[in-house]
Amino acid sequence: SAASDVYKRQGQISQVLGVQEMTAHHTVLSTWLHGWLFRLGRALGSDNLGVFLYIVLQFLVCAWVFGQVTAFAARLGCSRGVQYAVTAFFALDPIWGAFIQTQVKDTLYTGLFVLFVLKTADLLLFPQEWQGSRPRLTAYAVLGVLCCLLRKNGIYAVVPMLLASAFTVSEKRLRRPVLAVLLAVCIGSFGFDTFTEKVLDIPAGSVG
């Protein structure tokens, strides 16, 4: 069909379909996510459905994250007006609606990175709630790894933030746990890249 021909020319989907060589240019995790949902849609009878499922994933993640931004503003004691303004910024600015419908790695990465920044702010402003909370620190580490795996240069934002947080957090007992999160992010990111390149033989792409 015409739709199938269009998707064959779309970089990440064409790699999943075997039309182009599989590379890590767009990050392997992002390409896999595209591919899994595209193939699910195809299995259900429609390539368009597969693309729609990926866009729905982006929509759900970003809608929840942007809602968390508003909730965090409320937690900081911001007025209702500020909370409404934050909500309006995400809900009414047309750039966000267009961005959510864009089938690229940047959309999902943006949502998760905003959440990572939000959790970093939470760590620095409310450190007492993080003290001894392994589930919270584990989720923080997983989030950091995902940010690195969905965009190659994500590591250049995540690692400095973690390093700075480790030495500026007011609760000194949190320094080692945050450094442990930093170590986990580096191991997870480099480990995944090494596995896909050396074991799965997927050639590396440009940084971006």
How should these model regions be labeled?
Residues Q12, Y156, P177-G208:
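Juxtamembrane membrane-water interface segments immediately following transmembrane helices
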Residues R136-R151, A184-G188:
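Membrane-interface alpha helices of multi-pass inner-membrane proteins
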Residues Q101-L108, L150:
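Short acidic/glycine- and proline-prone juxtamembrane loop motifs at membrane-interface regions
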Residues L17, Q68, L108-P127, Y140-G144, ...:
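Specific aromatic-rich, kink-prone transmembrane helix
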Residues M22-I55, F59:
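Short hydrophobic/aromatic helix or loop-helix immediately within or flanking a transmembrane segment
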Residues Q83-P94, G144-C148:
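Short helix- or helix-capping micro-motifs
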Residues A2-Y7:
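Short, small-residue-biased leader/transition segments that mark boundaries at the very start
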Residues V56-G77, L115:
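Transmembrane-helix motifs of polytopic, lipid-linked glycan transferases
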